[in-house]
Amino acid sequence: MIRHILKIMWNQRCSNGWIFAELAVVAAVLWMMIDTFWVDYRTYHAPLGFDIGNVWRFKLSDLDAKAPGYVPDSLYHSSDPEDLTRLMTQIRQNPEVEDVCVTFYSCPYSNGNSWREVKPVDGDTIYAAHMESFQMRNVTPEYFRLFRIRTVDGEPVYDKVAGRHNVIVITPEMAEGFYHGAPNIVGRRVYHGGHDLSSEIAAVSTSIRTNEYERPEASYFQCLEGETYNSTVSSFGASSAEFCVRMKRPYTQNEMNLFLDGMGERLKVNNLYVYGITPISSFREQQLSQKEREANNKISLMVFMLVNVF
């Protein structure tokens, strides 16, 4: 029957050309829809490269000069990096806390967008002739342990960077662009922020994605340790840090509020203090809601096109 109908349509193709045109449009639209949905599905369910379970972001600020407990400059004997380090230590000592780290515009789902020019010192690659800009994440070494980031070989990145100064961690996409699959990438050096500063590659992490709707891109982590930590904290200010804490078990908002109440003065170092908390999952929901609206608009447009074809 179908062959007979197609045969009739073919014999009358001159008068029924519009039918073939409509079928071609329908087929094209269906293919676009299926291809788009499949790509989005695969992208959404691909590994992110990090884990935000039980992670909270503590909000930091500086006491106002008129606030009770304010420490005047005449009595201030520590620096911003020292205060931030001490605050991390005080919170980490709580038995309910699993880990603590600090980042600057680099926390997952924070919309951080710091870029820096990078070039391999010894790479014979497409990037060797001139500096290229890549997204940079400023993180303390504990970041890799807290968010459970691993190397391409499945080992903890934290073990590769702990206690080391002036090292970076690059993603596989950046490693491929620099060295095109060459062995022994770890230990090589790259220039970043100009030719006056070079850092050693301590590890190649797994691919890192910004969110569930984005594909992984070439990027790198600058490990804040030693002088790099001091200069970065002094530049941005301790209260600008993204202070992340992973708890040992899931907590509700009310339970976390009680946790803060129990910490008391341990949430304050000189004029630096914690004034609030937000689960990282809330930042995820905010960021994905916009992406989901865009995806729904795409679906609506495709359905509209399909309905109009019929």
Region spans (language model):
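Acidic-histidine catalytic/liganding microenvironments
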Residues: 12, 91-95, 182, 267
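Short, strongly hydrophobic transmembrane alpha-helices
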Residues: 13-42, 50
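Alpha-helical membrane-protein architecture signal
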Residues: 2-6, 17, 296-302
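Mid-to-C-terminal secondary-structure elements
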Residues: 106-288
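A short amphipathic helical element positioned immediately N-terminal to and/or at the very start
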Residues: 1-10, 87
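Membrane-proximal extracellular/periplasmic loop immediately following the first transmembrane helix
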Residues: 36-123, 130
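Generic structural signal for small/hydrophobic residues in well-ordered secondary structure
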Residues: 40, 58, 91, 97-100, ...
